[in-house]
């Protein structure tokens, strides 16, 4: 019951921010996406830590094909955004189009200099801890901004529309598949790191969305 109330409180917050100043929310979304891009390209990609979502899937595909993660994310997101425009409608797609464009651009941009930051943090535990907190902060701000980064969220919305599976459950299924793919390719240790990051970051998201209490 408590989780049910928290979920609906999150939804009400997201609906509320949709009515607030577009450009202020856009600035916060951009800053949060920039932070996510730095952490993703500096720590997650080099260490092959798959935490789900399109960014996690990109690490898996990179291992299989050798393509850069930024290129994979750009291609997959573009395809999903186009599909969402026709399937989900223009009204639902507009925030996804804007958000996905900024997010993928910043993922590509941060990948150009993130390698120069890798030497500043070499302790494995600190890498996981910093990644957990930073990703939680970034995602929390992204959710509060009312924008959508695209990726697996689009796929979940499409599955929800046609198969009537709750979006949260769709996301769980998709992310579980991606994380298990990472476990198969990179081993159980990397998967434990990913689960730790997801657990801590989800707590950070709750703090940003709902407050300390």
Where do the protein language model's features map onto the residues?
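Core subunits and conserved enzymes of cellular information-processing
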Residues: 2-213
């Amino acid at each position: 019951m408590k989780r049910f109330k928290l979920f609906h409180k999150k939804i009400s917050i997201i609906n509320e921010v949709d009515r607030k100043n577009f450009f202020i929310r856009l600035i916060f979304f951009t800053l949060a996406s920039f932070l996510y891009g730095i952490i993703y390209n500096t720590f997650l990609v080099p260490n092959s830590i798959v935490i789900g979502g399109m960014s996690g899937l990109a690490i898996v595909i990179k291992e299989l094909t050798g393509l850069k993660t930024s290129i994979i994310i750009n291609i997959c997101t573009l395809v999903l955004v186009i599909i969402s425009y026709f399937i989900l409608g223009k009204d639902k797609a507009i925030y996804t189009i804007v958000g996905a464009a900024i997010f993928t651009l910043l993922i590509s941009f941060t990948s150009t200099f993130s390698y120069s930051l890798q030497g500043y943090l070499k302790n494995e535990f600190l890498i996981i801890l910093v990644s957990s907190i930073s990703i939680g902060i970034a995602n929390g701000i992204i959710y509060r901004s009312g924008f959508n980064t695209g990726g697996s969220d689009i796929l979940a919305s499409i599955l929800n529309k046609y198969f009537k599976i709750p979006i949260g459950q769709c996301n769980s299924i998709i992310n579980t598949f991606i994380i298990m793919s990472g476990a198969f390719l990179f081993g159980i240790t990397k998967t434990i790191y990913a689960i730790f990051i997801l657990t801590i970051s989800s707590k950070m998201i709750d703090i940003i969305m709902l407050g300390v209490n």
